[in-house]
Amino acid sequence: MSTRNRFRFACFMAAMIAFPAIASAQSPQLGQPIAPADIAPWDISIGPDGAGLPPGRGTAALGEAIYAAQCQACHGEKGAGRPNDALVGGKGSLAPGKPPLKTVGSYWPYATTLFDYIRRAMPFQDSKSLDPDQLYAVSAYILHLNEIVGKDDVLDAETLPKVKMPNRDGFIPFPRNP
């Protein structure tokens, strides 16, 4: 190897050794730290155990009118579907050899998932517009249509997580952090 190539190689190696130190010493200085109080309004996650459910309450009897006004145009009368997905029916359709109808009553494992989804995404044209009482009521109505809760059963942060969905045991737990 010529002296010139040795010099180039030595410069290259010095740069490779120095680069990590230079790169870690400089930061782009973008943004600013965010306080937990600023994150709280965005943290609307609700777990299967009901952690994160807001105060409020509702019944299927109260939810029927809310459903008719906010949901029926897309999910059909009594959750039958058309033009969008059915919310009701499909019991027993997850068995082998049958085409599955994945509805709230046949597929979803937790009632809190229904509340969480409606809270985040519905009604489609005006998501996040329903207050907690309306959310509990329309959730109760959909669960009532699926014969999971009674028309006058009160759903709230304490009772909603206790609702036993028909397919709760139909999923295999998968540990994400073994």
Task: List PLM regions with ranges.
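The canonical Cys-X-X-Cys-His
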Residues: G63, Y67-E77, L87, V138-I142
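Gly/Gly-Pro-rich "capping" loops immediately C-terminal to redox-active cysteine motifs
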Residues: A60, E64, A80-R119, P123
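Electrostatic cytochrome c docking/interface patches
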Residues: L30-I66, P123-D126
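Bacterial N-terminal signal peptides that target proteins for export
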Residues: S2-F12
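Extracytoplasmic/periplasmic, Sec-exported soluble proteins
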Residues: P55-T59, S106, Y110, S127-L130, ...
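Flexible coil segments in periplasmic/lumen-exposed cytochrome c-class electron-transfer proteins
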Residues: P36, Q125-P178
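Bacterial N-terminal signal peptides
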Residues: A10-A21
